[in-house]
């Protein structure tokens, strides 16, 4: 699965359509982290071919309700019909209600405290939870220290809540070592690196190889 980041990344709404459809053609699921929890930010990526959305800074029931209304058709929501890549081959409009995924991003103590209620009420609509470690650390007064005791406690509590509701749980991670660490502690969704980071790594690898000729 590929996550396209419209909140902090180099993608923007005008250039994700072709990229999403390329992913569709090679059967690579693509999730779009939207800029904010508003209808036009959530609905449009699905029209352009995204397989789901990730809602950043989720810490209220109203945000979850807005997300569901913005991406689901009747009887679950109020999404409008349209877009060049809304439907996959063989789908009808109601298939989208079960085939497009909603992930919420927990990035604060407020979000952690409300997560059980969110998953109790809307668990049938939420595919999984992604932790935003940097924003969470900053909001807890930890700076960018995402491995301090306070953060480890917060992350573990989030994992426990997701396991209670049998929901996928993951986090943005710096590398495979961090992914392995959290895999052993219950996570099953690993958002590793960025498109620019991967590009830089591959450029460095190719340069090193050429320099060895």
Predicted regions and their residues:
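Glycine-rich, proline-tolerant flexible connector loops at the mouths of alpha/beta enzymes
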Residues: 1-18, 131-149
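Hydrophobic faces of well-ordered beta-strands that scaffold small-molecule active sites
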Residues: 2-4, 30-34, 53-55, 102-106, ...
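Short, acidic/turn-prone active-site loops that include or flank metal/cofactor-
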Residues: 6-10, 58-60, 193-199
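Alpha-helix-loop-beta-strand connector modules within alpha/beta enzyme cores
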Residues: 12-35, 39, 43, 47, ...
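C-terminal helical cap(s) of enzyme catalytic domains, especially alpha/beta-barrels
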Residues: 19, 61-77, 143, 196-213
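Conserved anion-binding
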Residues: 40, 50-128, 133-138
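Non-catalytic positions within long, well-ordered alpha-helices that form the structural scaffold/packing
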Residues: 46, 119-122, 183-184
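C-terminal alpha-helical cap/extension of soluble enzyme domains
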Residues: 79-88, 100-110, 150-213
